[in-house]
Amino acid sequence: MRFLTKFLLFLATVYFGLKYACESPLRAQYPQLQLACHYSQPALWNDYLLKNSPAYKNSVHPQLVVAKGKYEELVQPHVKDVCKRVHTQLDRIDKKKYCDLAHSYANLAYQKAQFYYSISAGKYVHDFCKSDLYNKNLKRHVERAKEDLSKAYHLAVVRIPQLFTRENVEKFTSSASAYINEKTESLKKEAKQITSDVKKTVESEIKKRTTSSESEEEPIVSTSTIVKTITRTRHSSSSTTSTKSAEETSEKNLETKEEEDITDIEIDHQAQLQRDFDKWTSNIDKKVKMVNKMLVRDVKKHLKPKIDANDKLFKDKLKVLHKEANDNFQLINKAIQDINCTQGIDPETGKQIYFDSEGKSQIEKYITREMIRTMLNDTQTTLNSLVADIENDVSKILEDFKKIAENSREQHLTTFEEWGDIMINEWSKKLAYLDVLAPHEDAEHEGKSKTELSEKNWKKFMAIKKQILDARDKMAKRQIKISEFKLLLDNVQNTLQAVTNENGEYLYILRAQANLAFQERERLEKEAEEAKLRKEAGEVNESSEEEQIVEEPISA
């Protein structure tokens, strides 16, 4: 059932892939593709069956017409909507990496198929290709099929990716560019309109304030940390006859007004200080995120050449591992086949020689259990050595990654600490300045005395300082994750694990096959030895009977 499900899924994948290729512009360039598209159309087979099959025409076709009508009415609108959304999402996907991934898996499957083919079926296929049945009847058909498969492979691997890289990308780029330009122009118009409205509002407000102040007040600007507008009553220049008591009264009123303004300045300082606390708290989080982002970027920059170089190195070493395993397994498999050998005598030297199981080719030496055991152990040692060498390279690149990460982390931590020290010093100076600036210890803001406000401000300052130190500690302990580096290590380790398991399993299978072959050979040798002994015993009995027959007359 599982095989049937996979087979049906494979057929569906091939059908829809062929349908997609038939709708592409490449169809006109390949006659084989046109032929495949022609014979894969359901309408063609429907017409053929209507003409040639009465059962299909009378029983199946009417039901198909009803089902098609229900499909177009109930299902097709939803399918079109889903297809539209899917195609929209597909146009946004970078298809190159998926093509590369599929190619890597296909390459791995090809290597494994070639490996098992060379071990199990290669010999039989080679003998079949030399037979008259193949050369006289099947060879021309196989060559034609190979030619068609080669053209189909060229279509699938070389031409189809162009659909994803040229036409669709150009279409998406042009539509995206037009959409962005349209939105940009709209935003520019809105920004100009807002600027114009704000400018008109500000100018009218300034004009109103200027007109009203000309008749009543004269603005005096204070240049303290928080700008505050203080007004004084304009004294007429013509009142030169005012008395001394009037002047004293005016001075007292002015002093009282300045004291009130100082209190207002303190209140504005407190409000501005709270806003600054909030800004710096959020700014610390932004700074930490920026430093972490720069850290990952620098580590990626330094690791990129090493990742590329080690990727090629690991691929080459894994190829060597595959080749070494294939070669050793073929030698062991050949030796196991030669266990069931036949004996012969060299006519020139008179020495005993051995031939393969079919008696066609001479083998170098008689296969023993010790020879097979040595070959298996040597193969295991060689493969373990190659795996250990690759694991050693993995350990080295891990050490390099740790060094690069720690060096970059140290640099960025130093920068962050310097920034934090400067900020903390500036904040401490600012709070000390505010403590000295206030002349009245009993000044109140929101029901709190100046002492309570100062204590509250210093507590907030200590909280910000602690936030900086905690952020620094988290950055020092934070793990740096590079997706490209992790992908490389995962691929190598997974491949090594799979190869090690496969090699171990196959060595176990070869060992079991060798034991069975030796047991069979020992059984045959034992039977041959017993037959030989029985034959010799029979000859001895016959000779003794003849002697007795001869001796009886003599004794008589």
UniProtKB/Swiss-Prot annotation:
Chain segments annotated as coiled-coil in the UniProt record: 135-201, 481-547
Low complexity: bias regions: 220-244
UniProt feature, compositional bias: Basic and acidic residues: 190-208, 245-256
Protein localization: Mitochondrion
Signal peptide: 1-21
Disordered: region residues: 190-263, 534-556
Physiological role: Involved in spore wall assembly. May be a component of the mitochondrial RNase MRP (MtMRP), a ribonucleoprotein endoribonuclease involved in the cleaving RNA transcripts to generate primers for DNA replication in mitochondria.
Species this chain originates from: Candida glabrata (strain ATCC 2001 / BCRC 20586 / JCM 3761 / NBRC 0622 / NRRL Y-65 / CBS 138)
Gene Ontology, cellular component aspect: mitochondrion; ribonucleoprotein complex
Protein family membership: Belongs to the SHE10 family.
Main location group: mitochondrion
Subunit-structure text: Component of the mitochondria-localized RNase mitochondrial RNA-processing (RNase MRP) composed of one single RNA encoded by the NME1 gene and at least 31 proteins. Absent in the nucleus-localized RNase MRP (NuMRP).
Any one of the GO BP annotations: sporulation resulting in formation of a cellular spore
Gene name per UniProt: SHE10
Assigned keywords, A-Z: Coiled coil, Mitochondrion, Ribonucleoprotein, Signal, Sporulation
Identification of the protein by name: Outer spore wall assembly protein SHE10
